[in-house]
Design a protein with these regions (language model features):
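Conserved acidic carboxylate
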Residues: 7-8, 96
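Two-component/phosphorelay signaling modules centered on CheY-like receiver
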Residues: 10-34
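Acidic, metal-coordinating helix/loop segments flanking the phosphotransfer/catalytic sites
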Residues: 31-55, 63
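Conserved phosphotransfer microenvironments
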Residues: 52-88
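Conserved acidic residues
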Residues: 54, 107-110
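Hydrophobic beta-strand core positions in alpha/beta domains
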Residues: 57, 93-94
Length: 147
């Protein structure tokens, strides 16, 4: 499974990776750590058929730029840019330390707490993604036989 994580906090990122490794066997992770780098990366993937991400996980608040300490509600920009430039069909999870009410199109949300494991949350998300993927495969097979 190929997962793209947009997260500025190293400690939180390490915890996320640890918990993802516990629930995903064949895991490849690519990380971006600020809003502008993510937006530029997404733009570079536009019209690129090599995009093979299975899940995007993004923080809700993070610095706009690498050397900035001012946090912005970046999830809105990240999600909209990803959907416009990369893929409308890849599931998106907002993983935030703060309760959030992001008014945009995401599939999953996880409230991050440093003392709580995310394994159960990630396991449910991965199971749901796999179930939906299997359902799509079944639909394609049925369409072949119906023709």
């Amino acid at each position: 499974m190929n997962i793209l994580i947009v997260e500025d906090d190293d400690y939180k990122y390490k915890n996320m990776v640890r918990d993802l490794k516990a629930v995903v066997e064949d895991l490849n992770i690519f990380r971006l750590n600020n809003c502008m780098d993510a937006l530029m990366y997404f733009r570079s993937l536009k019209n690129n058929s090599d995009n093979d991400y299975d899940l995007l996980i993004t923080d809700n608040y993070m610095p706009l730029r690498k050397d900035s300490f001012d946090l912005v509600q970046s999830a809105i920009y990240i999600i909209n840019s990803f959907k416009n430039d990369v893929s409308e069909s890849v599931p998106i999870c907002v993983c935030s330390s703060d309760k959030f009410n992001v008014k945009c199109d995401y599939d999953y949300s996880v409230l991050y707490e440093p003392t709580k494991s995310l394994q159960e949350d990630f396991s449910k998300i991965i199971d749901d993604i796999n179930r939906k993927e299997n359902d799509l495969k079944d639909e394609k097979i049925l369409k072949i036989y119906i023709k």
